[in-house]
Amino acid sequence: MALRFEILHQSKKSRARVGRIETAHGYIDTPAFVPVATNGALKGVLDHSNIPLMFCNTYHLIVHPGAEAIAAMGGLHQFIGRNAPIITDSGGFQIFSLAYGSVAEEIKSCGKKKGGNTIIKVNDDGVHFKSYRDGRKLFLSPEISVQAQKDLGADIILPLDELLPFHADPTYFHQSSQRTYVWEKRSLDYHLKNPGIQSMYGVIHGGTFPDQRKLGCKFVEDLPFDGSAIGGSLGKNLQDIVEVVGVTAANLSAERPRHLLGIGDLPSIWATVGFGIDSFDSSYPTKAARHGMILTLQGPLKINNQRYSSDLNPIEPGCSCLACSQGITRAYLRHLFKVHEPNAGIWASIHNMHHMQKVMREIREGILNDRI
């Protein structure tokens, strides 16, 4: 079955809504946080059964072990032992981000290429690039990307698009946008030949230009995508993100689920959920955990700080995550980080992921009560 989306409550205070997405592998209560499992695994988190939707990266899975190899083993759900919904990207984000650097690096570098020029050539056919593992030459077209995602068997898939740096040349930005929408149409056409149980979201580009965002919305809305994903460069700070997401969401129909690509830190979630965003993906909680940043209701806690060296309180008093319920103290967790014990990142990641799910439940409750 393709996904079904139902709005259960529309807030009287904002455009925020509580909904439910149903897929062949289960349902997702929205708004939802979607953690990124780059290679099919959440770093530092052993149990993902309580995570409603997980984001896996097609590019990395193509490079190793290969989409066809995963298909031969029954698909991604079987391969990683997950009986719950999965979303995959097209592979384009990783290709272009490896060439230009992360979003933050794009901004700082004003679009100068990073990563040893992994992109060989981009044209209307697709993108020629080098594997980050062994340097072999690879090619990704809209059709190849979608077929790879069909081999993986994710519940929600994305069309191939081109990610540009924040300060891309305006002329090339226009050319890229036009090419991206051609790629998206080709991706959708290929998908619709044999949709199976999968659904495809259209990706809306346009940078920080409101008129381009509106054009992107019209493009996606006019095609039979199952949902909408707000993608591309969203600006250089939270204010830019809020402005871009606000304009974009206002030009999308309410009937389709809306996903915000690559944005899932708590300040951004709180700032944009009121626009009616239904899901947010990010590696934020696990990456923060590996660097000793602990998420709490009182704000982030830098566990490496000397003040926690003899603190025998749980990581967060009152928290029911596995780490806190097993009595992992702040002093002990700090010690593990200081001696570079791998368990440090594991306990911190378990806590941070639990915290994100807790915050999303609170957000849904706030919307249901018209407080958000």
From Swiss-Prot:
It catalyses: 7-aminomethyl-7-carbaguanine + guanosine(34) in tRNA = 7-aminomethyl-7-carbaguanosine(34) in tRNA + guanine. The active site is at D89, D281. Coiled coil: none annotated. Substrate binds at D89, S90, G91, G92, F93, D161, G232. It comes from the Bacteria. It is an enzyme of class 2 (transferase). Zn(2+) binds at C319, C321, C324, H351. Pathway: tRNA modification; tRNA-queuosine biosynthesis. Homodimer. Within each dimer, one monomer is responsible for RNA recognition and catalysis, while the other monomer binds to the replacement base PreQ1. This is Queuine tRNA-ribosyltransferase. The gene is tgt.
